[in-house]
């Protein structure tokens, strides 16, 4: 059954336009609350609500609070807190659910709502569909004796800071390291600097002055140029860039080189494999560079590919019983440390790995160079693009065997097929990408 409101990461959109309106968000809170009450009729459920630093967070927080309490659910409010912080506190406080008001790496004009289930895990499909079904029912406020209560909780940030620090090995310290930390003017602005400072690092802070409008604005994991310049200017050892809600990580070394999620996952996996502590293998996505897969195989580390989206990486990790995975975008999962992707915790795992291996980022990542990728977006007229591309696709896969691969991905929002070819030779990637694209264009003419 397809979802009507939920995407791969909750409900998201431009503020003031459906579904990110106070009216709909209140009803969303009510629907989710009714589902929680139906699942736990012996006691009154409690949910945790956190948000990033967008100006619209105040409005949407109030709407959610109204919806949940109308359904008879108690609400705890944390104020600004990273998405993984809400996941952690949902588990630590043994709550029925956690809710985050954030649009992650998007600009301030957007916002979204995503849920964590009991235990700090993302909602499964069945629960999302229950909430969607409840959204189609009329909203009926509980009698006054059955309304929920709401209050702000103290110490949420401090508890999460201590949790982050606990994932860094006790025998190690960040003393002697100079770090530039870019918090994207987002939810980690009052968290990440304290974590690194309390572990001993000398800090330079950027993107730590949110005003409601500057989240992800030329700062953060999606705009590493600012971090590169700051690392070079301050002669720092490393730069750490997080995104607006704190679940992505990009790093920069002392020479100003940028390291994406794939490279950082490789660093973590290599260090764990060297110590015999890597459980199973590594999960990436269909877009993970093949060169990384081959490098892991040389280390004897199995590699699996999930669909694009950290939700699907997480599902495959659980299915295989593995712990490490993620995406080039900087979503990194270390399931022995946290139930969800966490930029701060991932950066601590990278820094610990470097200390344990006694190598630099550049030295470890020299194990592999990303294969060149050619991406062509092909617009079609609704034709059978799979049939049209079958012959050149088969030829390409035969020609690239062991040297590259082809990924064809239809857009979910427009009549476009994304043709991606990667190979150890740029000309080879270009040739086959153009051949497949031309075959689709021919039947669409």
Swiss-Prot record:
User: Which keywords does UniProt give here?
Assistant: Isomerase, Magnesium, Metal-binding, Phosphoprotein
Cellular component terms per the entry's GO annotation: cytosol
Organism whose genome encodes this protein: Chromobacterium violaceum (strain ATCC 12472 / DSM 30191 / JCM 1249 / CCUG 213 / NBRC 12614 / NCIMB 9131 / NCTC 9757 / MK)
Gene Ontology MF terms in the entry: magnesium ion binding; phosphoglucosamine mutase activity; phosphomannomutase activity
Family to which this protein belongs: Belongs to the phosphohexose mutase family.
Details of cofactor binding: Binds 1 Mg(2+) ion per subunit.
Provide the binding site for Mg(2+): 104, 243, 245, 247
Cystines in this chain: none
- Briefly, what is this protein's role? Catalyzes the conversion of glucosamine-6-phosphate to glucosamine-1-phosphate.
* EC main group: isomerase
Please list the residues that carry the modification Phosphoserine: 104
Active site per database record: 104 (phosphoserine intermediate)
Gene3D superfamilies referenced in this protein's UniProt entry, alphabetically: Alpha-D-Glucose-1,6-Bisphosphate, subunit A, domain 3, Alpha-D-phosphohexomutase, C-terminal domain
Keyword match Lipoprotein: no
The cofactors named for this UniProt entry are: Mg(2+)
What Enzyme Commission number does this protein have? Answer: 5.4.2.10
GO annotations under biological process? carbohydrate metabolic process; peptidoglycan biosynthetic process; UDP-N-acetylglucosamine biosynthetic process
Give yes or no: UniProt keyword Ribonucleoprotein: no
Its recorded name reads: Phosphoglucosamine mutase
Matching entries from HAMAP family are given as: GlmM_B (MF_01554_B)
Q: How is it modified after translation?
A: Activated by phosphorylation.
* Family matches, as InterPro entries: A-D-PHexomutase_a/b/a-I, A-D-PHexomutase_a/b/a-I/II/III, A-D-PHexomutase_a/b/a-II, A-D-PHexomutase_a/b/a-III, A-D-PHexomutase_C, A-D-PHexomutase_C_sf, A-D-PHexomutase_CS, Alpha-D-phosphohexomutase_SF
Which reaction is this enzyme known to catalyze?
alpha-D-glucosamine 1-phosphate = D-glucosamine 6-phosphate
Taxonomic superkingdom: Bacteria
């Amino acid at each position: 059954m397809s979802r009507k409101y939920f995407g791969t990461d909750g409900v998201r959109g431009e503020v003031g336009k459906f579904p990110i309106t106070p009216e709909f968000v209140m009803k969303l809170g009510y629907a989710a609350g009714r589902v929680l009450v139906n699942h736990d009729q012996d006691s009154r459920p409690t949910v945790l609500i956190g948000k990033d630093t967008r100006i619209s967070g105040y409005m949407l927080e109030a709407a959610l609070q109204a919806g949940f309490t109308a359904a008879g659910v108690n609400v705890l409010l944390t104020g600004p807190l990273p998405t993984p912080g809400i996941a952690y506190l949902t588990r630590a406080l043994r709550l029925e659910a956690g809710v985050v008001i954030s649009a992650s790496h998007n600009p301030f004009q957007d916002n979204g709502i995503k849920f964590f289930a009991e235990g700090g895990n993302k909602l499964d499909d069945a629960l999302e569909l229950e909430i969607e079904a409840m959204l189609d029912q009329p909203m009926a406020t509980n009698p006054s004796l059955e309304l929920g209560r709401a209050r702000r909780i103290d110490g949420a940030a401090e508890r999460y800071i201590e949790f982050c620090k606990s994932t860094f090995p006790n025998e190690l310290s960040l003393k002697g390291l100079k770090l530039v930390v870019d918090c994207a003017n987002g939810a980690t602005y009052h968290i990440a600097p304290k974590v690194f400072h309390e572990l001993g690092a000398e800090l330079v802070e950027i993107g730590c002055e949110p005003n409601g409008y500057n989240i992800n604005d030329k700062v953060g994991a999606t705009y590493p140029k600012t971090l590169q310049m700051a690392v070079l200017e301050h002669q720092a050892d490393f730069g750490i860039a997080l995104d607006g809600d704190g679940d992505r990580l990009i790093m920069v070394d002392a020479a100003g080189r940028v390291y994406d999620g794939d490279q950082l996952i490789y660093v973590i996996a290599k260090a764990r494999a060297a110590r015999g502590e890597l459980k199973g293998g590594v999960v990436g996505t269909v877009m993970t560079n093949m060169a990384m897969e081959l490098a892991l195989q040389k280390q004897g580390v199995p590699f699996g590919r999930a669909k694009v989206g950290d939700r699907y990486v997480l599902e495959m990790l659980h299915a295989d019983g593995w712990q490490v995975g993620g995406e080039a975008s900087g979503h990194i999962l270390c399931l022995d440390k946290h139930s969800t992707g966490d930029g701060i915790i991932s950066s601590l795992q990278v820094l610990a790995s470097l200390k344990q291996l006694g190598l630099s980022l550049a030295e470890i990542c020299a194990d592999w160079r990303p294969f060149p990728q050619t991406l062509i977006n092909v617009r079609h007229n609704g034709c059978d693009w799979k049939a049209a591309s079958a012959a050149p696709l088969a030829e390409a896969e035969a020609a690239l065997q062991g040297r590259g691969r082809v990924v064809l991905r239809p857009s979910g929002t427009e009549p476009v097929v994304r043709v991606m070819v990667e190979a150890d030779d740029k000309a080879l990637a270009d040739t086959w990408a153009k051949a497949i694209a031309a075959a689709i264009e021919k039947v669409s003419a």
